[in-house]
Swiss-Prot record:
Keywords tagged on the record: Disulfide bond, Repeat, Signal
Extent of the Sequence repeats: 34-39, 40-45, 46-51, 58-63, 64-69, 70-75, 76-81, 82-87
UniProt-annotated stretches for the region Disordered: 28-49, 64-85
Protein name (database record): Protein WAP-3
CDD domains to which the protein is assigned, alphabetical: WAP
A GO term for molecular function: serine-type endopeptidase inhibitor activity
Originating organism: Sus scrofa (Pig)
Region: 8 X 6 AA approximate tandem repeats, residue numbers: 34
Organs and tissues of expression: Large intestine (relatively low levels).
Pfam family, one: WAP
Disulfide pairings: 104-132, 110-136, 119-131, 125-140
SUPFAM superfamilies associated with the record: Elafin-like
Amino acid sequence: MRSRSFLVLVAVFLICETLVAQRLDRIRGPKGQGQDPVEGQDQDEGQGPVKVEILDIGQDLVKGQDPVEGQDPVKAQLPDKVQDPVKAQPPIQGGFLFPKPGVCPKIIFCPLVNPPIKCWRDSHCPGVKKCCPSLCGKGCVTPR
Protein backbone atom coordinates (compact mmCIF):
# COMPACT_ATOMS: atom_id res chain seq x y z
CA MET A 1 0.00 0.00 0.00
CA ARG A 2 2.88 2.37 0.71
CA SER A 3 4.39 2.01 -2.76
CA ARG A 4 1.02 2.88 -4.30
CA SER A 5 0.70 6.09 -2.27
CA PHE A 6 4.29 6.98 -3.24
CA LEU A 7 3.44 6.54 -6.93
CA VAL A 8 0.37 8.75 -6.51
CA LEU A 9 2.54 11.47 -4.94
CA VAL A 10 5.06 11.23 -7.78
CA ALA A 11 2.28 11.45 -10.38
CA VAL A 12 0.75 14.50 -8.68
CA PHE A 13 4.18 16.15 -8.47
CA LEU A 14 4.86 15.59 -12.19
CA ILE A 15 1.44 16.96 -13.14
CA CYS A 16 2.04 20.08 -11.02
CA GLU A 17 5.49 20.59 -12.60
CA THR A 18 3.95 20.34 -16.08
CA LEU A 19 1.22 22.85 -15.22
CA VAL A 20 3.75 25.31 -13.80
CA ALA A 21 5.92 24.99 -16.92
CA GLN A 22 2.92 25.62 -19.20
CA ARG A 23 1.93 28.64 -17.12
CA LEU A 24 5.44 30.09 -17.39
CA ASP A 25 5.37 29.61 -21.17
CA ARG A 26 2.09 31.54 -21.37
CA ILE A 27 3.49 34.36 -19.24
CA ARG A 28 6.70 34.64 -21.25
CA GLY A 29 4.89 34.35 -24.59
CA PRO A 30 5.78 32.24 -27.62
CA LYS A 31 9.40 32.27 -28.74
CA GLY A 32 10.49 33.58 -32.13
CA GLN A 33 7.30 35.34 -33.18
CA GLY A 34 8.13 39.03 -32.79
CA GLN A 35 5.51 41.71 -32.20
CA ASP A 36 1.86 41.70 -33.18
CA PRO A 37 0.95 43.75 -36.27
CA VAL A 38 -0.56 47.22 -35.84
CA GLU A 39 -4.36 47.30 -36.00
CA GLY A 40 -5.61 47.95 -39.53
CA GLN A 41 -2.32 46.88 -41.13
CA ASP A 42 -2.15 43.70 -43.19
CA GLN A 43 0.68 41.33 -42.51
CA ASP A 44 1.45 41.07 -46.24
CA GLU A 45 2.09 44.82 -46.53
CA GLY A 46 4.95 44.77 -44.01
CA GLN A 47 8.40 46.00 -44.86
CA GLY A 48 10.00 42.61 -44.33
CA PRO A 49 12.94 41.85 -42.08
CA VAL A 50 15.08 44.73 -40.90
CA LYS A 51 18.66 44.66 -42.15
CA VAL A 52 21.37 46.02 -39.89
CA GLU A 53 24.55 47.50 -41.31
CA ILE A 54 27.70 47.97 -39.29
CA LEU A 55 29.14 51.27 -40.40
CA ASP A 56 32.83 51.97 -40.81
CA ILE A 57 33.73 53.52 -37.47
CA GLY A 58 37.10 55.00 -38.47
CA GLN A 59 38.12 58.62 -38.05
CA ASP A 60 37.10 61.03 -40.77
CA LEU A 61 39.83 63.05 -42.44
CA VAL A 62 39.92 66.74 -41.75
CA LYS A 63 38.81 68.68 -44.80
CA GLY A 64 41.76 69.99 -46.77
CA GLN A 65 44.35 67.64 -45.18
CA ASP A 66 45.76 64.40 -46.51
CA PRO A 67 46.63 61.50 -44.23
CA VAL A 68 50.26 61.21 -43.14
CA GLU A 69 52.21 59.00 -45.54
CA GLY A 70 52.81 55.49 -44.23
CA GLN A 71 50.11 55.69 -41.58
CA ASP A 72 46.58 54.37 -41.81
CA PRO A 73 43.70 56.32 -40.33
CA VAL A 74 42.80 55.11 -36.84
CA LYS A 75 40.04 52.50 -36.92
CA ALA A 76 37.69 51.93 -34.02
CA GLN A 77 37.70 48.42 -32.67
CA LEU A 78 34.43 46.52 -32.96
CA PRO A 79 33.41 44.15 -30.16
CA ASP A 80 34.13 40.47 -30.77
CA LYS A 81 30.49 39.50 -30.48
CA VAL A 82 27.48 41.71 -31.02
CA GLN A 83 25.14 39.52 -28.98
CA ASP A 84 24.87 39.03 -25.24
CA PRO A 85 27.52 36.50 -24.07
CA VAL A 86 25.12 34.84 -21.61
CA LYS A 87 22.49 34.24 -24.28
CA ALA A 88 25.19 33.07 -26.71
CA GLN A 89 26.13 30.15 -24.46
CA PRO A 90 24.81 26.76 -25.53
CA PRO A 91 22.13 25.26 -23.29
CA ILE A 92 23.47 23.06 -20.51
CA GLN A 93 22.05 19.58 -20.05
CA GLY A 94 20.11 19.25 -16.86
CA GLY A 95 16.66 20.50 -17.38
CA PHE A 96 13.41 20.60 -15.53
CA LEU A 97 13.90 17.71 -13.11
CA PHE A 98 17.65 17.04 -13.37
CA PRO A 99 20.15 19.47 -11.82
CA LYS A 100 23.08 20.97 -13.73
CA PRO A 101 26.56 19.61 -13.04
CA GLY A 102 28.67 21.18 -10.31
CA VAL A 103 28.48 21.82 -6.58
CA CYS A 104 27.06 24.90 -4.90
CA PRO A 105 29.53 26.87 -2.77
CA LYS A 106 29.13 26.60 1.02
CA ILE A 107 27.29 29.37 2.82
CA ILE A 108 28.54 30.58 6.20
CA PHE A 109 25.93 33.01 7.49
CA CYS A 110 22.97 35.12 6.34
CA PRO A 111 21.83 37.94 8.65
CA LEU A 112 18.44 38.44 6.96
CA VAL A 113 15.32 36.91 8.49
CA ASN A 114 13.46 36.47 5.19
CA PRO A 115 16.09 36.36 2.39
CA PRO A 116 14.99 36.94 -1.25
CA ILE A 117 14.61 34.02 -3.64
CA LYS A 118 15.71 34.88 -7.21
CA CYS A 119 15.40 31.36 -8.69
CA TRP A 120 13.65 28.11 -7.83
CA ARG A 121 15.64 25.50 -9.81
CA ASP A 122 18.68 25.20 -12.09
CA SER A 123 16.58 25.59 -15.24
CA HIS A 124 15.78 29.20 -14.23
CA CYS A 125 19.49 30.16 -14.43
CA PRO A 126 21.25 31.00 -17.73
CA GLY A 127 24.23 29.06 -19.05
CA VAL A 128 26.34 27.11 -16.58
CA LYS A 129 25.00 28.83 -13.46
CA LYS A 130 23.09 26.83 -10.84
CA CYS A 131 20.32 27.90 -8.51
CA CYS A 132 22.05 27.73 -5.13
CA PRO A 133 21.43 29.17 -1.70
CA SER A 134 23.69 32.22 -1.88
CA LEU A 135 24.78 34.49 0.99
CA CYS A 136 21.20 35.60 1.44
CA GLY A 137 18.41 33.73 -0.29
CA LYS A 138 18.65 31.68 -3.46
CA GLY A 139 20.30 32.99 -6.61
CA CYS A 140 22.10 31.98 -9.82
CA VAL A 141 25.70 31.18 -8.87
CA THR A 142 28.65 29.78 -10.84
CA PRO A 143 29.22 26.30 -9.33
CA ARG A 144 32.56 24.92 -8.10
